Amino acid sequence: MSIRSLLLGSAAALAATSGAQAADAIVAAEPEPMEYVRVCDAFGTGYFYIPGTETCLKIGGFIRFQTAFGPDAADSRYKQVDSTGADRSSSDWDAFSRAYISFDAKSDTEYGTLTGFFAAEFNADNDTDAGDSFIDVDEAYIQLGGLKAGFFYSWWDKGLNGETDSIGNNTEFNSIAYLYDGGSFQAGVSVDELEGTSTKSNGVGVSGIVSASVGGVSFDLLGGYDTEFEEGTIRGLLSADLGPGVFQLAGLWASNPNAYWARSEWSVAASYRFNATDKLAITPGAQYFGSLQDSLTSFGSDDAWRAGVTVDYKITEGLATRVSVQYEDEDNGDDQVFGFVRLQRDF
């Protein structure tokens, strides 16, 4: 055998071996592209697309520490030597902490924006010896365009700037509401379940609102009728940009105590939020209550008034503090000074 024949035979054998190995080789699959979270700016800041969907989600909340002061700020403590009701005591101050988290999901449909909203509070307070920390559903509702159904804050929850005013009784219900939003003009109606607020287990209430705004001035006219008590309330609220702040004025009247308002037959409240700097705001306020409630179904002849101030200071981005000091004087009652100091981190 010649050297040439030997070399050719060896080369052919190597080629055959390489071909067989190539046929049996395992080829790694190409990695699938990773889908990163995308920012959604269709509904404002803070939203992102849920991966694999066209639904935008926003997660928010706050952590709050607050110390309140005033008569019976904590009134369900028992002395360690005796846990009976006869030895119940009270305190003129109370501290608590709260964590709040919300989930807001939105998407566009042929009927308008579809929203699903859920928020919960996690409260920690040692107001009783056993402790009363609890979890509370703050809101849970579905909204499609102007139609809203679920558990949410009603139009009665809107108040004045600061912490002085009280212009709503029960402000959160399981409701079905519709609001027409024409920009500078709004009108809406709500059917509310008044569970635990009237004479029956499941009462029904109806609320209606008309709102208008022109430039820096806005006005709300709100009414509510409690079908169980067969009584109603009307309320007006004016807000106007004035100088370096916002002036607000509210007035309300009730035929008799009902689920929407029960403190007094009529009341007038006002506040002015003075924006001293970009970080500091000072809000004095006052309110007068005419013919205070004296029974479940009627008003009496006593009056009351309240005045106070609220100070807000933005420490840094996402961290702020609020101090509230209020004074109240009621006919045939003790004068009271009350308020709180709050530290809150928003996210």
Language-model features and meaning:
Residues 11, 47-49, 102-104, 141-143, ...:
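Outer-membrane beta-barrel architecture
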